[in-house]
Amino acid sequence: MSRRTEQVIGVWGELVLLAKKLPKANFSEIAKLAMDIQSLHQICCEGNSVACVLGRRWLMNYICSKQAVLSSKFAPCCELPEPFRGECIITSENDDTPDLSPLPLSRFTEDPFICKQTPAKQDDSLQEFLYEYSRRHPELAVPVILRVDTVYQNLLGKCCKLENPLECYSHGEEIFQRVVHDSHERVKNLCDLREKLGDRSFHDRLIVLYTKKAPQLSTQELVVFTKNMAAAASKCCPLNDELQLACMEDSAKLMLGALCRRHETEPINAGVGHCCDDSYAFRKPCFDDLQVDGTYISPPLSCDKVINLKEDLCKAQEQEFQTEKQRFLSHLVKQKPHAAEMKFQSIIVDFAHLVERCCQAEKSEMCFQKEGSKLIEKCQSLLGS
């Protein structure tokens, strides 16, 4: 992703956050603040600590001087000294949403002259659409709103090439609703899967899915990444539909952002690269839909090298045992990404039962040696099939 693209995403992401937080503020104030905050981020990230502190102080002074038109929630914060004032403003709750009319479609999907605007004017119009949509949908996560905005931009790009563009883009509102519905459905399906499988088996399923998508990652990286995904699902899935969507989208944004930074440092594969670089707004759906990496050639694997059948397993904490089991599962998937999932699960279940049985045996080590050979044989049979 280019530096210019990152800056645009940064400004537009800030604009969404600000429009949700300050729904009573007008567009010009929100657009100015978004630019100022993004510029301050850049200064601070470049390591200029003096300019960063001064810039932050100036920004908070400006916000407090404009609190009457920005937010009714800032008054207690603006009475505090620095640095408490800034932290208070950032963590303050969203202002009460005013009684807004429906999205002014006459300006965005019913205006016959949209395509005749200059590029600069069209860019302003797109930002204003983002502002108007965001303040009307405080319940939606930033990535979902950016998804709607991306679809709107693509719609105009396609329709403005036609003889009758208005007829083409006048269906915009239905398309926006489909984007939100699709985002809801993806999260609902994930949460339904977790409920059906239970937490442990759900994490195992994530191991299988993401090992297929990114087999170049080490088994440890895959275990940690999917553990974070499973934890996010445990936190978000019990929430109601609206909160569930926002919670999962925000969590995925952070986790996939970390994965993409890993890819930037040490490339994983073309599929991951495509999802990271192509569209920030559609990053999560892209990863959801990513299939088996057919280019990956796994180094030869001997089952006795990856199946840890030693007495110290009996002393392991439950989490350590689960991690060992999931590493084994990831190794198997790397070898046979197209094998039926039931075959993986069969070996994993046998592994768990063997550990339980041998740990209860009087001579655990002897049990592991005797019973373990059968498991290794079954494992080698899968790899050889």
Per-range role (PLM):
Residues 1-385:
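General marker for long, soluble alpha-helical cores
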